Amino acid sequence: MSGNSIFSRFATWLASPEVFGSITKKIPGNWQLYEYYVDLEEDLIHLGEADLKSNNELLHIQFEEDEQFSLNEQLPLPVFKKLKLGQWSVHRNFITLIDPSDFRNNLEFQFAFQKNDLKLLKKDKTGKIEFFGFFRSEKSEKAR
């Protein structure tokens, strides 16, 4: 019985994001922004789900299994304005959105998963938060 419990915990760990390479398996899919923070002129601004709806703001990112992505956004932020399609790449806890035509438009985010939600964090060189967003997958949206 004890061996069975250890085996099930080991199997669970193998499927978890802590195992090298398995975290990229959680990324592919359609992700919808439902909350974000941005640091504007020394003020940390927070917009929740109701704020996004009332302001008609949206950000939808589709990550394909072949490491392509597409982005649809209507946000009053300059972060995503120059990049709509490209490739994505993961190294440790960073995801890079790569512009195939101009590397200067590449975007790098720290990312994490919590309760099946995707968190993306982008800071500038001084540590100021340019974007800290929380995303739900369409799968979890349909389950609601």
Name the predicted role of every residue range.
Residues 1-144:
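Lipid interaction determinants
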